[in-house]
Amino acid sequence: MSRVGRLPIAIPADVTVTVTPDNLVTVKGPKGELVKTMHKDISIAVENNEVIVTRHSEQKDHRALHGLTRALINNMVIGVKQGYQKTLDLVGVGYRAQLQGKKLVMNLGYSHPVEIEPIDGITFETPAATRVIVSGIDKEKVGFAAADIRKWRVPEPYKGKGIKYENEVIRRKEGKTGKK
């Protein structure tokens, strides 16, 4: 059995999980609703406030899908119950972020401001001029939106300037030593 896949997923009291025969999983909770189609070779059952994920055979790809499916459903349950968020820090002289309506506008040293529209289900917050919080109920979309913001200025290894995740450690390099 898969170490991850064999564990049942506990369903909180205010969350409902429904599974159709064609493996369409719907998770509803206080923060919203998520729908995802899972692979047909994995069986998903809801019993006694738990979701149980089983596989039909011991093929290598079925073993891999077993843990993946369980993790995806667990992420959906956590998302509709608590939600997900990623925090980004802007490090650099003049690097700033602000909201204009729902749109995120950042000054990152380019000749123009960078404007990013949030994708469906994602919200941006700027508690400080150099901090951006990306939040939503879908873990995949939150990570995608945060990576989309970060790609505009990936942290460089010499001074550490750029957009980094909150607890990310930038591996630093030593500069040139020069002639003596």
From Swiss-Prot:
GO terms for molecular function: rRNA binding; structural constituent of ribosome. InterPro entries: Ribosomal_uL6-like, Ribosomal_uL6-like_a/b-dom_sf, Ribosomal_uL6_a/b-dom, Ribosomal_uL6_bac-type, Ribosomal_uL6_CS. It comes from the Bacteria. GO terms for cellular component: cytosolic large ribosomal subunit. Keywords: Ribonucleoprotein, Ribosomal protein, RNA-binding, rRNA-binding. GO terms for biological process: cytoplasmic translation. It holds the Pfam family Ribosomal_L6. This protein binds to the 23S rRNA, and is important in its secondary structure. It is located near the subunit interface in the base of the L7/L12 stalk, and near the tRNA binding site of the peptidyltransferase center. Belongs to the universal ribosomal protein uL6 family. Part of the 50S ribosomal subunit. This is Large ribosomal subunit protein uL6. It comes from Clostridium beijerinckii (strain ATCC 51743 / NCIMB 8052).
